[in-house]
């Protein structure tokens, strides 16, 4: 019976094994045939895949309102709906709006847009927008939350790119393939390789036992990030099957994946895996490191020579044939003390050794092509390799045949003026960063599941204008901020509020909340505590080391007075203030921050350590002038915080409140 049972069981196992192979073959056949059946031509009819056009300015009735071309497109839609634009905002309100838009800080007396964009704070403000999109973080997250101790160099690269108004098409190319570009000099080379941190910053399962799966997961994350960031397409959806909505077959996904398979992102895939980093040190810094290594090596020789001498003397004195397993147990106190002194010197030299600057980034590997993996399973590869190529919905280019990865060709294709998506996607992002909602509300998805543009002609006009003006973000900002559309008040007419409650037609300026970073920075600025040093890092974690200790406690501190941009962004454990005020998930692309209203926000603004520290500093400033009356002090405080004098009622209530603390003015204020 046992033998019969075994045979039945074995027969069942073999049948299931055969069925599994048949199933895999059928799935593979279906996947390959489906890839050929997707109608790329029909899919190209989607609005986002149409070539850019430059529509004529609409004819409007109210010819005195438009200040620049933007206003014609907005006003035409308003007039079509029977609505009128809101009146212009007063200068004080407009100044506040513009300063937060360009600098992320409370307004000063500067009114010139060009001068505001020439401040170093401009690059810091706009870099943070881009860092949302590229899922910037100072740690890996996921299973092994290792420190990205050199990620800050990419962050500083982005700050410098916005401050220098690097053309956006060049900005894109450098992030995808900076290491493949010809550098003007050594400084420029370091900048270019640092830019490729864009591809390396994503979260990775560093302890994944299946190395092929780990690599394909990393490639998938790169494709997903690249697609959403620059093209507004969810390319990653085609990994396991043809895209359910957009005309992107699985074959196109693996053709693109071959480019990143040919790119070296990781130094090692062994547990725990380590990402690749590019050297960004100067010849002088290299010599400093070599000198440190020489001193360390020399000290090790001193220790070895002294230990050998002591051991030889030990053999002679003790008349031993050989040393015991632990000869140090036989050392005298004086010998032990001398060895400890030598080892302390070694530790000091090692701790003071010059660390060579490195930057997260990628480099080219061996040119490789991939087959389709059925359902994304690398254990079920098709026999046919997919030549490296760009998505066919947007390109009729021939497959890549060179010995390089193809990243440079990919970057040039993405930034080609004939590509209908790249310029549309970035001008839409800039619009969203100013108005709180993009002309296409789904900023990261221009595919069939994304929303249609509210003002399609304006979107195309801006995209064409942007390209013709050298892909300049600063020029685009100036165009938008100079428009009558941007300068309206935020309260509309009763009719507009009723017929356009969501303000999709932009009959009024949108009400905008301060994000977490400008909120924090403003508190420090008003308290006179903000450290405006630009660039560098404040984090002290060693590269690749876990940011959590053995008790799962994160020792990261956020007490610095530097701008919020420079505070560590820890995946799986975002700073409380950031999290409280809707900081995006740093593990995914996010070009569209959300707004929430929750009780802890009010509690934070009442009694958090940051609030107590900054209000105490402001109080000391107010009380320092003994000549001021309570009324004058209240007026000064209002102007400092709100950039306006208090109303009569506000003044009356504030004076009455602080008057109750005559014996303890510090507490009252």
How would you name each of these model-derived features?
Residues 17-25:
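Sec-dependent signal peptide recognition
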Residues 34, 59, 214-226, 330-333, ...:
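Electrostatic cytochrome c docking/interface patches
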Residues 35-57, 128, 148, 161-218, ...:
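Post-cleavage N-terminal segment of exported redox proteins
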Residues 181-290, 578, 590, 612:
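Sequence context surrounding c-type heme c attachment/ligation sites in exported
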